[in-house]
Amino acid sequence: TKYLKYEFELRRNLTIIRGDSATGKTTLVDMIRTHMNDGESGPVTLNCDKSCYVVEGNLWKGQLDNIQDSIVFIDEGNEFVRIKDFARAIQQTDNYYVIVTREGLSALPYSVEEVYGIRTSGKYGSLKQSYHSFYRIYPDSTTENIKPEKILTEDSNSGYQFFDAVCAEHQMQCDTANGKSNVFSYLKAHRDEKIMVIADGAAFGPEMDRVLQLVHTRENLVLYLPESFEWLILSSGILKDTEVAQILQTPSDYIDGKDYFSWERYFTALLTEKTAGTYLNYTKKTLNKAYLSDSTKNAILGQMMKGKQE
């Protein structure tokens, strides 16, 4: 008999499993399917806080309609994970999703931190028991030691306005890609410039493969991917709020995936709520000038430097 064991913890609504064939990705989904069909009397033991289901094929919509507060596994080869219709449908649910895929899924807002490969370790004696665990594929920043001449942000909201003001003080340029899916083409078009890319790690997962390839082949790019600009402000300590400090330590304990499909949305709501009616009153579209006062600005930039060194 061969024993296989998979052990992992899900932190967010969307977890992506990548990797070549024969790394055990499909075996994991097969085991969940077997348990779904045979239950406790079957060969698979499942130890989990939530029910687990496999959704597949053309009837995915109907299957999803019947699943609540569960973990949904989707194996590679299910083309529906690419379509906007699927992205819309899952954002109306309170489930967690584990999707096996080889390519980036541009319709889905998944975090760079929740893209995993499966590592196999340990064969125990004659039992041939192998233990599988997840490992993170992407870093949340790259530490190439370059002095950028330009900062590129993914959109033109408050984050861009903040970095644009900082750049102006340092005779640097700040540009926006007008959407995360344009970051790659912007970098290709500006191949000779030293650029620091700042994007929301909480939803940059689909772009990471191709952008990281550019970073690795060129000496003049550096990536900085905080959860979001709002997370950066909250982490900088300027609010001096103990509840915020607790939330930042283990966000997954506080964020209800049903209300906030992406952590970036949660941190925006938290910052907006915590600063309402104060001099730091935050809105996503237009940066409050209070964030450009020296002490506030330096606290935010200081948090960035901390993140780069960790």
What are these regions (language model features)?
Residues I17:
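Hydrophobic anchor at the beta1->P-loop junction of P-loop NTPases
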Residues T1-Y6, S126-S130:
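N-terminal pre-Walker A segment at the start of P-loop NTPase domains
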Residues N78-E79, E113, I118-E310:
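Acidic, divalent-metal-binding catalytic cores of TOPRIM
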